[in-house]
Protein backbone atom coordinates (compact mmCIF):
# COMPACT_ATOMS: atom_id res chain seq x y z
CA UNK A 1 0.00 0.00 0.00
CA UNK A 2 1.14 3.52 -0.80
CA UNK A 3 -0.15 6.81 0.61
CA UNK A 4 -2.43 8.67 -1.77
CA UNK A 5 -1.20 12.26 -1.72
CA UNK A 6 -2.41 15.37 -3.54
CA UNK A 7 -0.17 14.75 -6.56
CA UNK A 8 0.26 10.96 -6.51
CA UNK A 9 0.74 9.77 -10.08
CA UNK A 10 1.03 6.22 -11.45
CA UNK A 11 2.72 5.18 -14.68
CA UNK A 12 2.55 1.54 -15.83
CA UNK A 13 3.18 0.05 -19.26
CA UNK A 14 0.89 -2.92 -19.91
CA UNK A 15 -1.24 -4.41 -22.68
CA UNK A 16 -4.44 -5.69 -21.05
CA UNK A 17 -6.70 -5.26 -18.03
CA UNK A 18 -8.87 -7.94 -16.43
CA UNK A 19 -12.32 -6.66 -15.48
CA UNK A 20 -14.07 -8.33 -12.54
CA UNK A 21 -17.53 -9.79 -12.17
CA UNK A 22 -19.92 -8.95 -9.31
CA UNK A 23 -17.81 -11.07 -6.92
CA UNK A 24 -14.66 -9.11 -7.91
CA UNK A 25 -13.15 -12.10 -9.74
CA UNK A 26 -11.32 -11.35 -12.99
CA UNK A 27 -13.39 -12.70 -15.89
CA UNK A 28 -12.94 -10.50 -18.98
CA UNK A 29 -9.72 -9.30 -20.61
CA UNK A 30 -9.83 -5.92 -22.37
CA UNK A 31 -7.12 -3.85 -24.04
CA UNK A 32 -5.44 -1.39 -21.67
CA UNK A 33 -2.39 0.25 -23.24
CA UNK A 34 -0.93 1.42 -19.95
CA UNK A 35 -1.78 3.76 -17.10
CA UNK A 36 -0.43 7.29 -16.81
CA UNK A 37 -2.63 9.38 -14.54
CA UNK A 38 -3.13 11.03 -11.18
CA UNK A 39 -4.16 8.31 -8.73
CA UNK A 40 -7.05 10.46 -7.44
CA UNK A 41 -8.70 10.11 -10.88
CA UNK A 42 -8.33 6.33 -11.10
CA UNK A 43 -10.84 3.70 -10.00
CA UNK A 44 -9.12 0.34 -10.43
CA UNK A 45 -9.40 -2.97 -8.65
CA UNK A 46 -7.92 -4.93 -11.53
CA UNK A 47 -5.13 -7.21 -12.65
CA UNK A 48 -3.03 -6.18 -15.64
CA UNK A 49 -1.21 -8.30 -18.22
CA UNK A 50 1.70 -7.44 -20.44
CA UNK A 51 3.33 -5.46 -17.65
CA UNK A 52 6.71 -4.34 -18.92
CA UNK A 53 7.89 -2.68 -15.69
CA UNK A 54 8.91 -0.67 -13.94
CA UNK A 55 5.77 0.72 -12.35
CA UNK A 56 6.45 4.35 -11.45
CA UNK A 57 4.83 6.24 -8.59
CA UNK A 58 5.57 9.91 -8.04
CA UNK A 59 4.18 12.60 -5.77
CA UNK A 60 5.35 15.77 -4.07
CA UNK A 61 7.47 13.82 -1.54
CA UNK A 62 9.06 10.93 -3.41
CA UNK A 63 9.62 9.04 -6.62
CA UNK A 64 9.40 5.25 -6.60
CA UNK A 65 10.13 2.59 -9.21
CA UNK A 66 8.85 -0.94 -8.68
CA UNK A 67 10.33 -3.84 -10.64
CA UNK A 68 9.51 -7.52 -10.35
CA UNK A 69 10.13 -10.84 -12.04
CA UNK A 70 6.39 -11.54 -11.71
CA UNK A 71 4.43 -11.06 -14.96
CA UNK A 72 1.14 -9.60 -13.69
CA UNK A 73 0.30 -6.47 -11.75
CA UNK A 74 -2.69 -5.71 -9.52
CA UNK A 75 -3.68 -2.06 -9.15
CA UNK A 76 -6.19 -1.02 -6.49
CA UNK A 77 -7.12 2.67 -6.29
CA UNK A 78 -10.18 3.09 -4.05
CA UNK A 79 -11.49 6.64 -4.52
CA UNK A 80 -12.67 7.02 -0.92
CA UNK A 81 -9.41 5.93 0.75
CA UNK A 82 -6.11 7.70 1.43
CA UNK A 83 -4.04 4.84 0.00
CA UNK A 84 -3.64 2.78 -3.17
CA UNK A 85 -1.96 -0.51 -4.01
CA UNK A 86 0.36 -1.60 -6.83
CA UNK A 87 1.25 -5.26 -6.43
CA UNK A 88 3.16 -7.66 -8.70
CA UNK A 89 1.57 -11.12 -8.74
CA UNK A 90 2.41 -14.48 -10.28
CA UNK A 91 -1.00 -15.17 -11.82
CA UNK A 92 -4.41 -13.71 -12.51
CA UNK A 93 -6.72 -14.07 -9.53
CA UNK A 94 -9.23 -16.86 -10.19
CA UNK A 95 -6.79 -18.51 -12.63
CA UNK A 96 -7.46 -21.86 -10.98
CA UNK A 97 -11.06 -21.69 -12.22
CA UNK A 98 -10.21 -20.60 -15.78
CA UNK A 99 -10.13 -22.99 -18.74
CA UNK A 100 -6.31 -23.01 -18.86
CA UNK A 101 -4.89 -21.98 -15.46
CA UNK A 102 -1.27 -22.21 -16.64
CA UNK A 103 -1.98 -19.77 -19.50
CA UNK A 104 -2.97 -17.24 -16.84
CA UNK A 105 0.19 -17.73 -14.79
CA UNK A 106 -0.82 -20.41 -12.31
CA UNK A 107 2.16 -22.69 -11.69
CA UNK A 108 1.72 -26.27 -10.51
CA UNK A 109 4.55 -27.34 -8.24
CA UNK A 110 5.40 -30.92 -7.49
CA UNK A 111 6.51 -31.92 -3.98
CA UNK A 112 9.93 -30.41 -3.33
CA UNK A 113 9.74 -27.92 -6.21
CA UNK A 114 9.99 -24.20 -5.57
CA UNK A 115 9.01 -21.01 -7.33
CA UNK A 116 11.14 -17.92 -6.85
CA UNK A 117 10.27 -14.31 -7.56
CA UNK A 118 11.90 -10.99 -6.90
CA UNK A 119 10.79 -7.42 -6.41
CA UNK A 120 12.80 -4.21 -6.12
CA UNK A 121 11.61 -0.84 -4.88
CA UNK A 122 13.85 2.12 -5.73
CA UNK A 123 12.81 5.20 -3.74
CA UNK A 124 14.14 8.74 -4.06
CA UNK A 125 13.01 11.49 -1.71
CA UNK A 126 12.29 14.78 -3.46
Which ranges hold each PLM region?
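Beta-strand secondary-structure signal
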Residues: 54-56, 85, 116-120
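Catalytic-pocket segment enriched in acidic/His residues
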Residues: 89-102, 108-110, 114
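Generic secondary-structure boundary/loop-capping signal
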Residues: 7, 15, 72-73, 83-86, ...
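Active-site/ligand-binding surface loops and adjacent short beta/alpha elements
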Residues: 1-69
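Active-site-proximal mixed secondary-structure blocks
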Residues: 60, 95-103, 118, 122
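A structural signal for short secondary-structure junctions
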Residues: 49-51, 77-80, 113
